[in-house]
Amino acid sequence: MKFGSFLFSPEKVEGFDFHVYRLKPETGVIGTPKEDMYNNIACFGDNVNAQKHPEWVAVSKDGPALRTNGKYNFRWDILCMTNPEYRAWILDFIENAAKVASGITLSSIHFADHGFCVCPRCVELWRQSGLNWVDWRVQTVTNFIREARIRVKKWGKPFFVGLLPDPVLSKERFGIDFDALAPYADAFIVPIFSKSYATAWHFETLARSFKHVLKKPVYINIYVYGPGDKPNEVPTVSELLKVSARVARTGVDGILFLAENAQRLIDFQKAAIQAEETLQEISGYGSEEFMKLIDRWKKLF
């Protein structure tokens, strides 16, 4: 089992097996590709381009794929997948990052949600395909991932595909068919982000479900401390330890920890090894690999 950092800054944190830099998060703010790290790219979640090019935003009968649309649970603005100009640009961006990075992880690779996208271009492409609506959306997502993989593998780099945490309806909602994507992904990353992990069994159930249905290695991404967060808005150290231990015992292949920067993650490491009461509790959870990680952290501080 491997453990990784997942940061908005191009920094490494000692005590982890690998490191991911959010080169292009859903905010749309773009950094510089970083060598000796995995680079993460949010594909169709892009607040900056949604603001610059409102005509690129995915649309539905219930409104656009914007954070302001209360009929959906959008945490960022989402672009139409079939926009040829943006699609070509993001594929080139992925390849340019792959030239430099240790590997590439993608997120926001899908349609916004059920009902998207019904722009004239998408409707016409769907009709021309001869497929039903669900199958056309699956084909669109899968073809994008296939092309992205070609760009990454041209440079001989690992290729991880990020999903959304819905193990049942991802196909119908987002056009994500787990089996169709499996031949192209070296591994899958599933974010189970929350600002509270008080009900850890729920997140354990999600992790266990994804390990069961996915046909490639599975990495679970856990939320520690995001940009702009205040201390009272993030999970407690006890919650993070318990949910990590529970997820680790599900048989997943690894866990990533998202944080704003290296210092936020170091602060978590230091607090974790001092949480003696919680560590005593989780020592009985049957999560040997996670407890070994804690032992590694103890040697650092």
Where are these regions (language model features)?
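Active-site-proximal loop/short-helix segments
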Residues: T105-N132
